[in-house]
Amino acid sequence: MAAGSTGERPFFEIITSIRYWVIHAVTLPSIFLAGFLFVNTGLAYDAFGTPRPDAYFQATDTKAPVVSQRYEGKAQLDVRLK
């Protein structure tokens, strides 16, 4: 070991190893697929409480809602959406 070395493998050695790619060939695509399904199934909207794209405006609306009171904005929008 060289002086000052922590004993860890160099990054280049890790990413050029077969073991790294065997593990990551499965995990990286599965993380991407999980995120894709999380968003496309609408679970992300439910988990974070955001309105779905079709719920921003009512069918009768012709323009975006305007909030007139800074601290009562959510209450104004909730009344409007009922």
Swiss-Prot record:
GO MF annotations in UniProt: electron transfer activity; heme binding; iron ion binding
The keyword Isomerase is annotated on this UniProt entry: no
Presence of the UniProt keyword Electron transport in the record: yes
Cofactor annotation remark: With its partner (PsbF) binds heme. PSII binds additional chlorophylls, carotenoids and specific lipids.
Its membrane topology: Single-pass membrane protein
Cofactor(s) this protein cannot do without: heme b
Keywords: Electron transport, Heme, Iron, Membrane, Metal-binding, Photosynthesis, Photosystem II, Thylakoid, Transmembrane, Transmembrane helix, Transport
Residues binding heme: H24
Record-annotated membrane-spanning stretches: 22-36
GO biological process, one term: photosynthetic electron transport chain
Localization of this protein: Cellular thylakoid membrane
SUPFAM superfamilies: Cytochrome b559 subunits (SSF161045)
Gene Ontology CC terms, in alphabetical order: photosystem II; plasma membrane-derived thylakoid membrane
Pfam family membership, one: Cytochrom_B559
Quaternary structure and interacting proteins, as annotated: Heterodimer of an alpha subunit and a beta subunit. PSII is composed of 1 copy each of membrane proteins PsbA, PsbB, PsbC, PsbD, PsbE, PsbF, PsbH, PsbI, PsbJ, PsbK, PsbL, PsbM, PsbT, PsbX, PsbY, PsbZ, Psb30/Ycf12, peripheral proteins PsbO, CyanoQ (PsbQ), PsbU, PsbV and a large number of cofactors. It forms dimeric complexes.
Family the UniProt entry places it in: Belongs to the PsbE/PsbF family.
Function of the molecule: This b-type cytochrome is tightly associated with the reaction center of photosystem II (PSII). PSII is a light-driven water:plastoquinone oxidoreductase that uses light energy to abstract electrons from H(2)O, generating O(2) and a proton gradient subsequently used for ATP formation. It consists of a core antenna complex that captures photons, and an electron transfer chain that converts photonic excitation into a charge separation.
Name of protein: Cytochrome b559 subunit alpha
Species whose genome carries this gene: Synechococcus sp. (strain CC9902)
Gene responsible for this protein: psbE
